[in-house]
Amino acid sequence: MDLFTQIKMAVSVKEAAEYYGLEVNRGNMVCCPFHNDRTPSMKLNEDYFYCFGCGATGDVIDLAARLFNLSSYDAAKKLAYDFGIDPD
C-alpha cells in the first residue's frame, strides 16, 4: 500500500485539523485558515474539507500541504511522522 493511501485510511481530516490546532465546533466546522475568516466556513468531512468562503477543498494530505506550504509528498511524510504511521 502506498503512503498516500495509508495516510488517508489512518487519519481523518478532522483528526488532522484538531492535531494542527484548528478549533472544530460541534458541526465539524472551523474558521478557514486559508483566508481571513471570523466565523467558521470550512466544513470537515471524514475524508475531505470544503470552505464555503474561499472554495478551498481537498483531502487530509491537501490540508497538511496547504497548512504548512509543503508538497503533497512532504505533507504525507509529515502526517505519517505526526501520527506514528510507518511509511514502509
Task: Show which residues each predicted segment covers.
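N-terminal structured subdomain of primase-like DNA metabolism proteins
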Residues: M1-D88
